[in-house]
Amino acid sequence: MDKATLTFTDVSITVNVPTGTRIIEMSEKVGSGITYGCREGECGTCMTHILEGSENLSEPTALEMRVLEENLGGKDDRLACQCRVLGGAVKVRPA
């Protein structure tokens, strides 16, 4: 199985993850400060700032783009419950 690296800068932890892993799944396990509510991409609570590696994430869905816009997300923000790590290295922090 292919792997990727995911770094949570707020807790200074880097983990190897299988490709396809959602950011929120590992955030919970490592104790990152990324909060969440619905886990369905509708509330915007898990907005996360992508510091590096956005090209290694799944494309945002129409729902994710709408929720980010409604919650004033910036160009480097994503919903941790929606985006999946596809490979390479990704570095994130709570938004």
Swiss-Prot record:
Its cofactor is [2Fe-2S] cluster. One of its GO terms (molecular function) is metal ion binding. Belongs to the 2Fe2S plant-type ferredoxin family. Coiled coil: none annotated. [2Fe-2S] cluster binds at residues 38, 43, 46, 81. Keywords: 2Fe-2S, Electron transport, Iron, Iron-sulfur, Metal-binding, Nitrogen fixation, Transport. One of its GO terms (biological process) is nitrogen fixation. The lineage of its organism: Bacteria, Pseudomonadati, Pseudomonadota, Alphaproteobacteria, Rhodobacterales. Ferredoxins are iron-sulfur proteins that transfer electrons in a wide variety of metabolic reactions. This ferredoxin is required for nitrogen fixation. CDD domains: fer2. It comes from Rhodobacter capsulatus (strain ATCC BAA-309 / NBRC 16581 / SB1003). InterPro entries: 2Fe-2S_ferredoxin-like_sf, 2Fe-2S_ferredoxin-type, 2Fe2S_fd_BS, Beta-grasp_dom_sf. This is Ferredoxin-4. PROSITE patterns: 2FE2S_FER_1 (PS00197), 2FE2S_FER_2 (PS51085). Binds 1 [2Fe-2S] cluster. Pfam families: Fer2. Residues 2-95 form the 2Fe-2S ferredoxin-type domain.
